[in-house]
Structures are given as structure tokens and as C-alpha cells.
Amino acid sequence: MAEPLRTHRVVVVGAGIAGLTSALLLAARGLDVTLVDKAATPGGKMRQVMVDGAPVDAGPTVFTMRWVFDQIFAAAGATVEEHLKLQPLGVLARHAWRGHEPRLDLFADIRRSAEAIGEFSGPQEAQRFLGFCRQARQLYDHLEGPYIRSERPTLGSMVGDLGPRGLMALMQIGPFSNLWRSLSRHFRDPKLQQLFARYATYCGASPWMAPATLMLVAQVELDGVWAVEGGMHAVAKAFSALAEARGVKTRYGCGCEQILVRDGRAVGVRLAGGEEITADSVVFNGDVNALAQGLLGDPPRRATAAVAPARRSLSALTWLVNARTSGFPLVRHNVFFDEDYASEFDDIFRQRQLPRRGTVYVCAQDRTDEGIGSDAPERLLCLVNAPADGDRRPFDHSETDPCEQRSLALMRECGLTIDWSPQTHRLVTPANFERLFPATGGALYGPATHGWMSSFHRASSTSRLPGLYLAGGSVHPGPGVPMAAMSGRLAAETLMAHLDSTSRSRRVVISGGMSTRSATTGGMA
């Protein structure tokens, strides 16, 4: 490896999955990498909280797109199997509706899902489901390269990369339509429309404003959903351990107060205690709005555009639970639907209030496809979508208690009873998320994916400030653990490409007889 690569210093700010990925891959390429995070442990949103003596995963709960992690570990000279224990789930999710029997399971086996839908909604809906899955597969196959793997896709580059067949597949789903309208063409049963419309919330969006292309989430789940031994926080710990083994210097419990800028480029960071760490490049794994609002200093404001509050994605009320349950056969992922799905998103995005008929998602963290085999307390994450207004109001008990009681009532009407007490659960509100992740209002998915052009409006890994690179769920390709990991990979690849380009150009200059500065003190293009 050339000397400039061995001596190039990088500071990664934020140890979410994107920052961990960038740090790991850059260190694996031989760069001098320091990773800082204000939290005492790695993971960002993939954190754990102690509830009545047990650690409960408090953030993302779904492990999909395993190929993303396989490729990242391979690039670092390791395998996922060496660091994580994964169990494929046969049941992707169990769905229930207020006052409605039976329940509906979706399976990793598409034929089993079709059979279940046939029993639930009739044979014609089962055939429509298979057609829906075929279209989702085609859409995913066409968009994976031009969009997910691309550093900065534009409408023009997408059109060119898709080619005639890809464009035809895209036009068949009605790309200018919203997800709900598209689903109404696929399914007649409103409960199936409601079930698959929930895919919009994976990006923090409303099905009535999200683009129809989000139907590709169906294919992501069909490609596999895994349970991680130790929970999703174990993924962060595995990344951190491998990064340290590859030479990354981790500084947990050290918040970044300012990104240092000199001569128009990022040159390091100042920690909350006043310590300065100089660097040739900085990777910022945090919400881009923190930069735009000047929370990392005034000079980095210009690095990216601000996200207006109206463009924020969903936040949530989450209850972290360690309690006994009864009456409902929970699996790993469970969804309890209320009636009038449209009102949930009208309440959140238009009325800016907690939903009066909110869907409740429950991750039963001690279960896979089967029960836990005892009446011992089990760890749950219960989630209801909420407006990202955590910087505008406190979300105190006068607002959250009625939502909590409505959510418990919905689960009871679907058959689930939880031993609920102040000791067995902890509530996290949008205001809490805002304090954990400043400048977001508590939004958990970056900008909302609303409108067919929204995917092109996300910041890319290359910021407007030379030497500063961006990674995370608010950055392309978007939210979710695998996509955020992909953004970290794209940031690392972009930084390396700039560094390689600069090294080559300097070698050309030197060969021409002109002097040049060391790559450790100069900038990258």
C-alpha cells in the first residue's frame, strides 16, 4: 500500500451502524482511523436499555439484506458467522386486527404465505399476492444497482442505468403513484392493503404520500429475515470489536462538540472536553440537520442543506418491556392493526398529534417462530408511530397516557395481555429521541420518503465541505440498518476514491518535476 494511504488520518463521528461500517472499512484499507461517540457503547439507535434487570433492544429490531453485512465483513477479512449467531425466521411477521379472526402470518416461503392469504382472503387474493411479489422482485432487481449501490443517483443516471427493461418494469407499477393507490390495484381486501401499506413506515413515511416503489420492501423480506442472538445491539458490538481488531481507535463516551474547519476543509474534531483530534478527513455519522443547524460549529453548516420540520419522517412512542404475557401466540415480529388506517397518518402528519387509532408493533425479543416455553417475563419493544415534534413539545403524560391505554386496549382486543406496571416498562417519546439524536425532532428515519422524487433529495456521502463525508439513515440510500450500513460503505468508498485520485494526480505532478505537499497535510479533491 502506498505511503499516503497508511498515513491518512480519519475521524469518524458517531458509532451507529453507518459510522462503524465506515471506520471498519477504512481501517481495513490501512488508514489511521479514530471513532468517537458520546454514548458509552456502540450502536447509535441500536442501543439497549435495562428494564427490571434485563437488557432490552431499544432501536431497530429487524435484520434483513444479509448480503450487505456479508460483503462488509468480507472486505475486512472476516465473515459474519465468526462474529454473529443468526437464525433465519420462518415466520416473517404475525398480523392481527381488532375484533377480527383469524390472524395472518407471512412466511419466508412465498407459497406458504400465498396459502395463508388464500385462507384469510380467498384464492383470488392469493394469486394477486403472487403477482405482487413478482412485480416487487422485478422492481428490486432493477433498482438495486442503479439506486441502492450508487453513491449519488440522479433521475438522469437512473434512467440511463435502468435501460428499456428496467424503465418498463418501473412504469408498470406507476412510479408517480403513491403506495396506497398502487396496493389498491393489487389487492381487493382492505386488510391486505393495510398490511402491505405498512412498508411505507419502514422509511418513516405515510402510505398515502410514499412512492409506489416502496413495494420492493416485500422482496427484501422474502430474501430473508434473521433473529440475532443477543439482539440487534450485538450487531453493533460485533462491528466495533472487528473495527478495533483492524486498528480503529474507539473513543466511546467522548462526544464531538465541533468539526474543525481550516482553509475551507474539515481538518478534525474538538471533543466535549476540549481535546482536539486532527485529521485529513472526517466522516459524520449523524443526522444531517445537526450540521445544517450549526450544532457542530458554524463553518460545517454549509456542508449540507437543512431538512425542514415538515419533511421529517415518523418518530415513535416506544415502550421497552420486561413482563409476562398471555393470550396471544407471539412470534418475533407482531403487528396489531386498528381500523381506519388513513386516520393514523392524518393524525401524525397533518394534525401533528399522537394517533387515535394507531398500529402497534411488538418485537418479542426472546422468541423466534415458537413460544418461549415458560411463563417467565419476556423482553418486548412495543411501538406506535408518532409525529417528530420532540423539539417543539414535551410529550408529557397528559398526551402519552391516553395513547398508552388505547394501545394496550387494542392488543387486548387482539388477544394479547401484558403484565403492565411502572416496574416492567420504560417509555421513550419523540422528545427523548430528540435529546438522544439532536436536530431531528425525534424523527427516526431522516427525511420522510414522500413523493416520487424524494429519494433523490437525500444528501449523498460527499458533502459540500471538502474533507467531510456523510453517512447514516438521513443520507442516501436511506433508513434501516442495512441501508445505513450501505451508506457507511459508500462514504468509505467515496473517501478512498478521492484519496486515490489525489494520490495519482500528485504522482503525475511529481513526475513532471514540480514540488507537492504530503498527502497527510493536503486536501482531497
UniProtKB/Swiss-Prot annotation:
Keyword hit for Oxidoreductase: yes
Catalyzed chemical reaction(s): rhodopin + A = (3E)-3,4-didehydrorhodopin + AH2
Disulfide bonds: none
Pathway(s): Carotenoid biosynthesis; spheroidene biosynthesis
Enzyme Commission number, as recorded: 1.3.99.27
Keyword Oxidoreductase: yes
SUPFAM superfamilies assigned to the protein according to its UniProt record, in alphabetical order: FAD/NAD(P)-binding domain
Biological process terms in GO annotation: carotenoid biosynthetic process; chlorophyll biosynthetic process; photosynthesis
GO molecular function: oxidoreductase activity
Keywords in alphabetical order: Carotenoid biosynthesis, Chlorophyll biosynthesis, Oxidoreductase, Photosynthesis
Pfam assignment, any one: Amino_oxidase
Function (record text): The preferred substrates are 1-hydroxy-neurosporene, 1-hydroxy-lycopene and 1,1-dihydroxyneurosporene, however the 3,4-didehydrolycopene derivatives such as 1,1-dihydroxy-3,4-didehydrolycopene, 1-methoxy-1-hydroxy-3,4-didehydrolycopene and 1-hydroxy-3,4-didehydrolycopene are also efficiently converted. 1-HO-carotene derivatives can be also used.
Similarity-based family: Belongs to the carotenoid/retinoid oxidoreductase family.
The protein's name: Hydroxyneurosporene desaturase
Organism, as annotated: Rubrivivax gelatinosus
Gene: crtD
